[in-house]
């Protein structure tokens, strides 16, 4: 870690320090802090000149923190909206996974010997106790919050807020105010696309995390803290960028296999303690209100909020990186609004990482033919082309005991050897002439000698005699004379690569050197000439055990830890030496094969109406043969029905006991319902529509009561849930995509 150093004027500084670094006074915050610059308003007005003066300092540490000039009392225009009054237009929820363990780093550096620091005003967060008025109390509270954050990160969902309200101008920096008018958005290093003429603010709550991200090699990023709680920021300089990428690939092997640029997804966080333990230089700082953090090209940085906070972010090109363009001021430096999403600056496709290097694959797919025989389409030889059409004929390969035809994977040396065994007139002198200038020694047998043991023995004998070496080829004879009888399908072919995977490890390719059927394993030559014995169960073929494994083997059921929560805070996490890792924990509905289902609201429909509709469809009646029913007759019939039903249920009857009263009541209600339905059917059979409506209005018993509606709705058959399947990719796209694409709701069927 860097010690606390304060550089003086160029004449008094070390010779290794450039004079550009010393023109502006700065100091280092703590043992692992970044430079803090407190410029005057005259030094900060011209942003382009300011960046030039601190360029080497920023490249060394990766970022610098700029404190608001003391002469600027109100940095924002009073006519515009204050940051505290801004309402977020969109809130997103997402999970951030942690890779690596977090532990406290004990520093042996004496903080008392640090260089002098200029006094600054400490803004104590509202979340901390009110008695934390001194800087020491503030730092202690921040340290406790950071430790609690890393211990409980994977147990909470994080919230992110965005708004498209009019931007707040930096009127005290004229160069930035002028540059904001252009709003040029750098997408895939294209200088034509234009950013919408609106501002973008970012809001976060407690534990809202900005995972590790990196800017374009030509871009500077400025993070402006508009108000609210502080943010903890981590910075990795560009000099350690490659080391960080390699370490990230080792810690997150699954994500690295799915996409080699998985860091651009911004869904994995690596604790700084793990990085420091592996030799990655990591700086940290606490960004407070009215402070700016400027990151330089190639710098990886990450942050999380210690409370409610509002940020503003924009990026611009470096004057020296844009050598092909003549930029006279910062307005032409392509200042643009930029969200906390790498997709806006780093569009990429999700392609799995190549398991073997290009050199390793070229060993299989490239010919050792002269340049004149290589086609113009590329270095790869056509699959169906033969090496020498004159020396081979199709009739030589009709019988099962004959030598297999030459393969495009065979070299000239292998093809010549095969031709020697097919031709009866070729002499040893002609054969020796074929090996002139041959420097490459084959480690495996030619493909033409796989199923012909006699030719194989002759080939090994000739190889030892002509090369004069003691290359030991295995004398293993295949047990299966036919490929169809081999346990693996398709059967292994010597010299060809096959995919393999041990347990839940990474997928790798290996060239088949031997097929040990008696031991049920293959001898594979992997990258860097490593020879590995792989059982048949680990070969990824359609007939192997690995090919028949269920999805649960690769996505096992995870057990949630027994953690007690009190108002959302785990209270017994101290009982564990370390919290169990929940990095791969996802909701059951988001697992593959279990799509998200949406059940629409059920419309309640009375059973009586459905019964009437069924009767009308099953027994149609003609309105010509049926005479209209007078209204008076209907009323009389209804009164007689009610009187009849009242006489049925007699409480004085000894048969109607306390236990049998409910059965009698059910039967009476059923009879009443049947009579009512018959009356309704007669009403609907009337030919005159006006008479029918009149009858319905006058008949009170025809209209079902509220109790009838509730009983009928309870007996309805529920419809099957409509499957609005949303894949896991769509879910991740919704929670992590940039704001300008979120407005396109065609990506989310459930939100249309």
From Swiss-Prot:
What Pfam families is this protein classified in? JmjC (PF02373), JmjN (PF02375)
Could you tell me which residue ranges the JmjC domain spans?
162-333
Gene3D superfamilies for this protein: Cupin
The UniProt keyword set, sorted, is: Nucleus, Transcription, Transcription regulation
Q: Where in the cell is it found?
A: Nucleus
Q: Where is this region: Disordered?
A: 391-438
**Location (main, coarse):** nucleus
One Gene Ontology BP term is: regulation of gene expression
Basic and acidic residues bias (residue ranges):
427-438
GO terms for MF: histone H3K36 demethylase activity; histone H3K9 demethylase activity
The segment(s) forming the JmjN domain are 34-75
SUPFAM superfamilies per the record?
Clavaminate synthase-like (SSF51197)
Q: Gene Ontology terms, cellular component aspect?
A: chromatin; cytosol; Lid2 complex; nucleus
**Positions with biased composition (Polar residues):** 391-402, 409-423
Q: Which InterPro entries match?
A: JmjC_dom (IPR003347), JmjN (IPR003349)
Give the SMART domains listed for this entry: JmjC, JmjN
Q: How does it assemble?
A: Component of the Lid2 complex composed of ash2, jmj3, lid2, sdc1 and snt2.
Name used for this protein in its record: Lid2 complex component jmj3
